[in-house]
A protein has these predicted regions:
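Interfacial segments of alpha-helical transmembrane regions
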Residues: 15-19, 72-96, 160
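Small-polar-interrupted transmembrane alpha-helices in polytopic inner-membrane proteins
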Residues: 87-106, 158-174
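Membrane-interface alpha-helices at helix entry/exit sites of multi-pass transporters
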Residues: 55-57, 84-85, 154-161
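Alpha-helical transmembrane segments
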Residues: 16-30, 89-93, 163-168, 221-226
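Hydrophobic alpha-helical transmembrane segments
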Residues: 60-76, 135-146
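Loop-to-helix transition at the N-terminal end of transmembrane alpha-helices
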Residues: 46-61, 87-90, 184-189, 243-248
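Membrane-embedded catalytic cores of phosphoryl/pyrophosphoryl-handling enzymes
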Residues: 120-266
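N-terminal transmembrane-helix/juxtamembrane module of multi-pass inner/ER membrane proteins
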Residues: 1-67, 99-128, 263-270
Length: 270
């Protein structure tokens, strides 16, 4: 991509705006912890659940990193359009989230409040680091990429707001299933803005799209879709509806892999 002065100024503005959002999320999240609003908020949510457990189980699936990767890759018109940005965000996000969890291992809600005080849905993790929420990061980063690309294509503004609202709901599902504190989700949202902005700037300077649109890139994408399909074949929910939906996503990933194989074979004959 171009590295003109216009892009440099734009990049600085993006990073400055994202810095403000990240600081707000960090201050808000830390304040919830310091003033013990985290526990009060968590208990109120689980004391009187508004929506059924199967609903949160289904929504929670959309925050899975592999599901998010599938959604983004399938949303491309053709391989190599925004694949580079997607993969950079996915890889950088995984690294940032796991690093923060390792450096600041905050206990999960069930370890502090007790499992009997929460409505735990689909056996959420109990012992790994709680902050930040990887699902919240994945959902928001997915929405940011989709909204950015769709806005450039001139998609109606109302659809963009719907994507943003759904991403917020997916993020909040981590609190509803008992896996994360509200502060974890808020910090995950802030981190998503930061990583997506950094990878966007990275993409404007050095893109992998040319290689990813080649025959070798197609092989990599076929491998990725195959891994996604294998991952999704393992049920992650106790609810049959969610299991069926998860299986349909696995089939979608296999279909995309087959399509890419056909494209790769066509490239070899040209």
């Amino acid at each position: 991509m171009s590295t003109s002065a216009t892009h440099v100024v734009s990049s600085k503005r993006i990073l400055l705006s994202v810095g403000v959002i990240l600081c707000f999320c960090l201050v808000f999240g830390v304040s919830l912890i310091i003033f013990e609003f985290n526990q009060q908020w968590m208990l109120r949510i689980h004391l009187d659940p508004i929506l059924p457990n199967w609903f949160w189980s289904l929504i929670n699936l959309f925050g899975d990193a592999w599901v998010v990767l599938l959604i983004l890759l399938v949303s491309e018109r053709r391989p190599g359009v925004m694949t580079s940005w997607i993969l950079k965000t996915w890889l950088a996000g995984a690294a940032f989230v796991q690093l923060i969890k390792y450096l600041s291992p905050m206990p999960r809600p069930a370890n502090v409040l007790g499992k009997e005080m929460l409505t735990l849905i689909d056996h959420p993790p109990l012992f790994s680091g709680s902050m930040p929420s990887g699902h919240a990061f994945a959902a928001i980063s997915c929405a940011l990429i989709l909204v950015t690309v769709m806005k450039q294509r001139g998609v109606n503004q109302s659809y963009l707001w719907m994507i943003a609202a759904f991403a917020g709901l997916v993020s909040w599902a981590r609190v509803a299933v008992g896996a994360h504190w509200p502060s974890d989700v808020i910090v995950g949202v802030g981190l998503a803005f930061l990583v997506v902005a950094l990878t966007y700037v990275w993409e404007t300077r050095s893109s992998w799209n040319h290689w990813l649109s080649s025959k070798h890139g197609a092989v990599l994408l076929v491998l990725i879709h195959s891994l996604i399909a294998v991952y999704l074949l393992v049920p992650q929910s106790d609810f049959l509806l969610v299991q069926i939906f998860q299986l349909s996503l696995a089939c979608l990933s296999v279909s995309k892999a087959i399509y890419l194989i056909k494209v790769s074979l066509w490239l070899r004959t040209t």
